[in-house]
Amino acid sequence: MHKTRTASIISLATLSLLLFTACAAPANHEVRPEVKSAQSAHAAANQQSTPEPTTEPTPEPATEPTAFTIAWMSDTQAYTAADSDVFGKMTQWVADTQAGYNTVLAVHTGDIVYNAFREYEWNNSVAAFAKLPKGMHILTAAGNHDQLPPENKETPYLNHRPDTDFDPAHAFDKTGLSYYMTFEAGGVHILVFSLAYGQELEASDWVNAVCKQYANHYAILCLHNYMDLGGYSSVGRRLIKSVIPQSPNIRVVLCGHERGMQYFAETPDDDADGKPDRTVHQMMMNVQDDAENGVGFLRLLRFDPAMDTIEVVTYSPVLDRYGYKVPVGGDRFGERKTLNDAGLRDFLTQEKP
C-alpha cells in the first residue's frame, strides 16, 4: 500500500515535469504551406493598397460652360461731334453692369467720330472708352468717318482707338487697320475680326486663312459696311460669297453704317449634302441720329453655351428704355430676342464627352 502510493506520486511528478518542459520549449513545428500562402497574399494586398507617392500634378476639374456677354455699340459720331455725354453714359453703363452680365468684350462697329480731322471728337471718344473697366477686351472696326482720305495715310484713328488686344502680328497689312484677336470666354474659344471700311474685300482671303488657322474658334466678324434694311450692301453681297461659305467657324456678323436695325440669318451647306450645317446670325445697328427714339441705344449679346443661344438685349442707358422702335423693314427684336442654333457647342475649350 505504501509502495503503491509512492509510485503514483512519482508518476504524477514526472508527468508534470514533462508538461512544463514541453510548454517552456520553443515551438519547432513547420507552418502549413496553405497558411504560408494566405499570409503572403495578405501581405501583398496590404502593400498594393498603399499607393506610391507621385510628383504628377492633380488635373483641374473640367469647368462647365457659362454664359458671357458682348456689349455692342456703333455709329456714335453724332455724340462725339456734339460734345454730348451720351457716349460716355453708354460705356459707363456697360462698366456698371459688367459683373451682372459677365461682359467680356466691348465692340464698336465703326464711325466712332463724325470728322476724323477734329481732335476734340477723338478726345470725346477716348474719354468714353476710358470708362470701360480694365480687363474687358475692346475691339473697334474703323468706319468711313474714322478715316482720312486715302492719300493721307496717317489716320488719327490708329492713334486713338482703344483696342486692348491689337497685335501687329495679327494685322491684315502694315497699316494695322484690320486685325483679329483671340481669347476664351465661358469655356468657348473666341476669334473676333475687325475689318476696316475699304479693306473688306481685299482682306477676304486673309480672313479665310485665319479662320482655317483657328478652326476650333467661334468666329465673329465685325465690320462697318455689310447690310442695310433691305438686304446686303455691295460689300456684303461679295462677302456672302467669298467669306461666309469658305469659313465654317464664322457664326456671327456685326455691322453698322446704314440707318436702323436689321437681322438676317444665313444657313450655309458646308458639306454640300443639300442640308444646312450652321446658322450665321447677322445684325446691323445704327440709330445714333434718331433724335426721338434712338439716343444712346446699344445691344448686349448674351451667349449661353449650355442652351446654345444668343439673347439680344436692346437698351438705352440715356433714355433708360429697353426696346428700340425699329422703322418699317427692320428687325422686330423688341426688348429681348433669343436666337437659337448659336453654334457655341462646337467650340468648347473642354473636350465634349
List the predicted regions and their residue ranges:
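C-terminal motif of bacterial Sec signal peptides marking the signal peptidase cleavage site
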Residues: 20-22
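Bacterial signal peptide processing site
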Residues: 24-26
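Active-site glycine-centered loops adjacent to acidic/histidine catalytic or metal-binding residues
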Residues: 75, 110-111, 143-144, 224, ...
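His/acidic metal-ligating clusters that form di-metal
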Residues: 92-105, 134-137, 177, 187-271, ...
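Extended active-site neighborhood of metal-dependent phosphoesterases/phosphodiesterases
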Residues: 118-205, 263-285, 298-302
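Binuclear metal-dependent phosphoesterase catalytic core
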Residues: 262-353
